[in-house]
Amino acid sequence: MTKLENDTFIRALLRQPVDYTPVWMMRQAGRYLPEYNQTRARAGSFLSLCKNPDFATEVTLQPLARFSLDAAILFSDILTIPDAMGLGLYFADGEGPRFERPLREEREIRSLIVPDPDTHLRYVTDAVRQIRTALNNRVPLIGFSGSPFTLACYMVEGAGSSEFRQIKTMLYARPDLLHHILGVTAQAVTAYLNAQIEAGAQAVMIFDSWGGALSHAAYQEFSLRYMNQILDGLKREHNGDRIPNILFTKGGGLWLESIMASGCDAIGLDWTIDIGEARRRTQDKVALQGNLDPAVLFSSPEVIAAEAGKILASYGHGHGHVFNLGHGISQFTPPENALALIEAVHAQSVRYHTD
């Protein structure tokens, strides 16, 4: 078993007693930090940053050098899997990620294969090992993947989308093709996350960034169903340690009970749901992660502390809460405001963990 200097994050995910509410931030290693931008400039491109374990390690550790965060998260991108499937990931200036060969033809879809994480994604597992060594058991390391549906959105659309015309057309006109994409992708995500766990990830998170774009019935059939398949095949222990998992569907507040039924350890919440109401609905059967609106970090330290305090008070006394943003931190966030949030959560949360 691994002895961590700070295991508060892991204990909170497992709903065990903690002395304060742990905090980390989605995209905590990112463009709001000047040191990140310097490293990215040295790397030459975002993909080079992701695919070089030395750079990925450096960037992963940068926010921990600034802030008293309770977890590190692997620096990578959710689109590594479709890139390894041969879709040709690239980043256009000012346009975000794009694929050279989006999935539109049945022949291409039927020929999809599950990439071997030990070969096609070796740079990711190498980075996990390197980061674990550099962390030296200071705090736990989170591994992650996009959900099958979210990955499929990019794979079919060929880029980010606001209306999801291509994938929703496929969903209703050729659901068999979309199910095939999702089935292969679910196998790929399972293998990928298990490889991260074997390399040293101490918790894993599935980002379902676009599941909230679906109708109620479509979410159950095309998103949650395949996350359930991943959880069924996911390692829950490694080298004697529990490996907790987090499911995060942006816009998923309608479906908390269904997500909880998946058997996940924790549910990530965006900022559109009251965390106290989410706790009542889930009846302390899962941990909850979230859920400050990232835009709060554009305000003052006083407002940040007050808004963080509202979330802590809404969750209330007891364990099972990991504080986070409701989505990724903006590149325009002043770093000192991220510091104000972390300090406020640590200071204000102690009262909720005392008898």
Swiss-Prot record:
Secretion signal, residue range per the UniProt entry: none
Record CDD domains: URO-D
Catalysed reaction, written as an equation: uroporphyrinogen III + 4 H(+) = coproporphyrinogen III + 4 CO2
Record-listed substrate binding positions: R27, Q28, A29, G30, R31, F46, D77, Y154, S209, H327
Enzyme class: lyase
Residues under site feature: Transition state stabilizer: D77
Location in or out of the cell: Cytoplasm
Biological role: Catalyzes the decarboxylation of four acetate groups of uroporphyrinogen-III to yield coproporphyrinogen-III.
The protein, known as: Uroporphyrinogen decarboxylase
Organism the protein comes from: Nitrosomonas europaea (strain ATCC 19718 / CIP 103999 / KCTC 2705 / NBRC 14298)
